[in-house]
Amino acid sequence: MRPYYEDDAVTIYHGDCREVMPLLPTPDAIVTDPPYGLGDKWQGGGGETTKSSWRFDPSEAQAWDSAPVPEVVDLASAAPAVVIWGGNYYALPPTRCWFMWDKKQNDQWTTAQAEMAWTNLDRPVRMFRMAQAEAYGSMNKEHPTQKPLALMSWCLEMMRLEPNALILDPFMGSGTTLRAAKDRGYRSIGIDLDERYCEIAARRMAQEVLSLRLGIWSQRVVLGLHARTDRVGR
């Protein structure tokens, strides 16, 4: 199957993860945030998310947006290490270790004060504390349930993966898992059914490559200037 995007660390596929995953190598880890209840959640609120350019159109909801995806349960045994955000919506096996995001929300009635991720790890519960208002900085959310980059990077840290591990996100969205994996030196594969998100994720990965190259170039320029200054000083 031809990738939608590919570089040295990241591969993105546009398609149904149920069809794409059998064609892929077995990953070392799965880190994902599958859709659940988006259709119901967003239809009554005017259709706009806070600090976001994303706008929900109920007519665009996928069939699984109004109910949990049953195939998500199969992911629990699809890799040696698995993290599934929203795992409390699924009939997943009992686990000792949940990842928790404490959003530090003061509102006790209308919004969740925390989010939960099911894991298959044999460790105590782990808590990530960051106010939702601070989690995204100046970045616009491009997906309704987009997780903060810092949160996904923390997930990977807590998983204690081997260097160069291969991470799969079958519900990639805007590509935050892939970005976090790339920043930590891991390889990753992302899949999404919506081509818009494949485009957004590919753009984020390409920008990272460009930023890295510009950073290396700038560093070389600075080092060159220092070298010239040293020669002049002598």
Tell me what each language-model feature is.
Residues 15-19, 220-221:
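Conserved SAM/SAH-binding loop
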Residues 9-15, 213-216:
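Conserved SAM-binding strand-loop segment of SAM-dependent methyltransferases
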